[in-house]
């Protein structure tokens, strides 16, 4: 099946909604006239993923500056969690160059034998930690919650605010003017505003959006 075709028939590929963890993306689309309604519907925050039982005794984000840790982090090229937030956290602590070697790459050793940059951190970091290839990794809190629900051999270490970027990380969503299912798109956004949807997000580790945001 070719992209844009089903059984040889052309299909419209214009989506009805667009979502991003970077609100600037939606503001840009609004400015270009492609989107007229958008909102932040939930929040996330950074957390450290460690091996179950935390054998390295990692207690805080500043411990990423320790010399005895092997780290696994999202790459700064294609993974927004690090490109926009994780790297900023390391810079706030003054350890960005030490942890990353100032490298911009993926599926690579940023610092040989010390810091690995993933291609898909949500899959690779838990596995590397379980396999003993890494001691710690920057992830979303929701990823720690999900991994533990799945019985993975990992734990989470909370990162104190404001380093965890909880006031900056908002999942935004909006309806696109060229979408063919406008009514359904607006109904879906209304659902995301409901207490039921907010409770579901919270059960996975998200922080509810404020009434002003939704």
Language-model features, listed with the residues they occupy:
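Exported/periplasmic ABC-transporter solute-binding proteins
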Residues: 1-4, 9-14, 22-23, 27-31, ...
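Phosphate-/polyanion-interacting regions in eukaryotic proteins
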Residues: 19
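Acyl-donor-binding surface of acyltransferase catalytic domains
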Residues: 34
């Amino acid at each position: 099946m070719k992209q844009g075709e089903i059984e040889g028939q052309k299909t419209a590929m214009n989506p009805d909604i667009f979502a991003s963890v970077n609100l600037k993306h939606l503001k840009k689309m609004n400015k270009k006239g492609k989107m007229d309604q958008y909102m932040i519907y939930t929040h996330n925050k950074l957390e450290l993923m460690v091996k179950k039982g935390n054998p390295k005794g990692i207690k805080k984000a500043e411990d990423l500056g320790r010399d005895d840790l092997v780290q696994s982090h999202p790459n700064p090229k294609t993974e927004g969690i690090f490109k926009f937030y994780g790297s900023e956290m390391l810079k706030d602590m003054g350890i960005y160059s030490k942890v990353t070697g100032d490298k911009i790459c993926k599926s690579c050793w940023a610092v040989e034998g010390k810091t690995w940059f993933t291609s898909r951190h949500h899959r690779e970091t838990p596995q590397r930690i379980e396999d003993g290839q890494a001691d710690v990794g920057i992830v979303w809190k929701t990823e720690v919650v999900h991994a533990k629900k799945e019985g993975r051999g990992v734990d989470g270490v909370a990162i104190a605010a404001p380093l965890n970027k909880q006031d900056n990380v908002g999942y935004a969503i909006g309806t696109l003017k060229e979408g063919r299912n406008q009514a359904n798109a607006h109904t879906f956004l209304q659902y995301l505003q409901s207490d039921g949807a907010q409770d579901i997000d919270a059960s996975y580790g998200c922080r509810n959006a404020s009434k002003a945001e939704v």
